[in-house]
């Protein structure tokens, strides 16, 4: 069979919509790996990890400028995308200028703003506070304008192995409406929509440390983002800060990260208020699903 993922997907049974499936990984004497929903001797539970793990703490930073009058708090956004932030000050003591409620703002790409300046009420005593910064990529004020997407690959036809509300792994807010499409490693992946490349990962091999594997995130003009996951190591051909058109080559499909077989995981997300969530979309062309596979509930 051409794809191990095909074997895995065909063995899944339809469960209740709210329940997640338990998947087992079995390696036989010849080293052949099989995924199944049956607990056979020697099989191990396949542990699902959230596919979308993106560290932004090196690109969205809270900075403190100390001066004779006190402290000035600034936030810097080094991303090529807007970022919504929320700053809360806790355990405050001997401070003037503390906001009465959390400060929220949407920082433009590649920008820095001042959020607050604090001074000591009693200059002979230290100024004390604990800042808590929350943030999420994207501008929640923007609304989606497109739901139908061209196929983000060349070749095929390929088959859908897990769709919206799929019970294996499409049950988190970030991935509920994602699509998994089985395809050979090295299949050309293209941008379903044009926009700005805002995040990439290109160096991961195998399962690695990031469940997303290698990926590309593209910000569209309506604030939504298309994300392409589990890409082949070294195949990402776009860079952060590059504007691309619909249909532009971006990478080749792979089997990296939290992947059970060669496939593309494609999801559209938007910031819904300090959190990224997936949103419904359709492919502009029909994509058949594998037989006997739970592609999700309504």
Residue ranges of model-derived segments:
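Acidic, glycine-rich catalytic/binding loops that coordinate metals and/or anionic ligands
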Residues: 145-164, 170, 174, 185, ...
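Active-site region of chymotrypsin-like
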Residues: 176, 213-240
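Short hydrophobic beta/alpha edge segments that flank linear recognition/processing sites
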Residues: 215-216, 244-257
């Amino acid at each position: 069979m051409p794809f191990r993922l095909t074997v895995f997907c065909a063995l899944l049974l339809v469960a209740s919509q709210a329940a997640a499936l338990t998947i087992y990984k079995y390696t036989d004497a010849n080293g052949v790996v099989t995924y199944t929903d049956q607990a056979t001797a020697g099989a191990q539970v396949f542990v699902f990890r959230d596919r979308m793990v993106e560290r932004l703490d090196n690109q969205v930073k809270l900075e403190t400028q100390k001066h004779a009058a006190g402290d000035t708090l600034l936030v810097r956004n080094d991303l090529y995308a807007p970022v919504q932030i929320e700053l809360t000050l806790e355990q405050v003591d001997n401070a003037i200028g503390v906001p009465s409620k959390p400060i929220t703002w949407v920082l433009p790409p590649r920008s820095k703003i001042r959020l607050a300046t604090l001074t000591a009420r009693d200059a002979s005593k230290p100024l004390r506070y604990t800042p808590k910064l929350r943030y999420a990529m994207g501008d929640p004020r923007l609304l989606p304008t497109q739901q139908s997407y061209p196929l983000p690959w060349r070749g095929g036809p390929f088959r859908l192995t897990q769709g919206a509300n799929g019970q294996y792994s499409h049950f988190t807010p970030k991935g509920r409406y994602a699509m998994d499409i089985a395809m050979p490693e090295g299949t050309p992946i293209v941008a379903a929509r044009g926009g700005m490349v805002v995040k990439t990962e290109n160096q991961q091999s195998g399962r690695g440390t990031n469940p997303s594997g290698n990926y590309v995130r593209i910000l569209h003009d309506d604030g939504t983002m298309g994300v392409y996951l589990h890409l082949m190591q070294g195949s990402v051909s776009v860079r952060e800060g590059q504007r691309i058109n619909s249909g532009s080559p971006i990478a080749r499909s792979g089997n990296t990260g939290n992947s059970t077989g060669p496939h593309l995981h494609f999801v559209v997300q938007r910031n819904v208020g300090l959190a990224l969530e997936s949103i419904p979309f359709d492919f502009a062309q029909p994509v058949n699903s594998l037989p006997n596979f739970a592609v999700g509930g309504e």
